[in-house]
């Protein structure tokens, strides 16, 4: 049997061509709508959110970019009010754990020897502090609590200390006199008191930043008392710009800026002695205590800003560098190129000078 062939008329062919053309056009439109919807879901329009408040005796300032609350509700993301509640919860937990200003904090109970059981927040701070102490040859030390308290930089009233008093308290100072066994803190001396203030705000900054990232908020900057972490870039592609304060003559002087730095996925923490000090017999005493002597540091380094991958480390190193002084801190940086720093110091002639590590040449600009 032969094969049958069906030939269409010209009119019928024209009709079919129009149908196929319309079908292809409709399919193209549907594909565009589909991908447009997917794109809008994956890359929604971002809105700027700002949060300000008080914690640990200082301020916090947070800026982040996220979808609108309407979009978040539709896509089962955390809304801005839920994000705020989450951050508040973090701040409360940290305050209840390591704050010296909170009489009921777990740290105060440990310092008073009411307990030696540490929670997760205390353990994380202890281990971070221990790491920085080892890294800096003991120039960072959390066991200075009793001395800092006696010098008048903590929550209690100050009294003038004699050399004998300082020497006696130094017996209980030394990070090696503390150790962690499971969840318990073991003190060599019960008189030893812990002070996490030199990393607490950096730790808080990191915890807030990590919380935002867990909630798909990757474009943000967190500042807790000057301890800053900048995540990602702004929606316009610009890096975050952070100001570095010019050291002032006294703690009440109006703030002026020395320079600005551009940051992306890094932290910057500044430590200085020009706003936190006490005066005794006409002499200005720094709030930074040398853990090897028990006395306030005395050198020409006015402030140091440390750039690191996380705020906890940057916070601890900034304190350690203020103890070391400029020259020893620079020696440390020569062997640890993963960290950068900006030094503001006074010369013998009384002039204020600035220096920085070479890696910052392209992202650091002098203030006008």
What is the meaning of each model-derived region?
Residues 11-25, 35-368:
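Mature catalytic core of soluble alpha/beta enzymes
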Residues 28-32:
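Hydrophobic helical h-region of N-terminal Sec-dependent signal peptides
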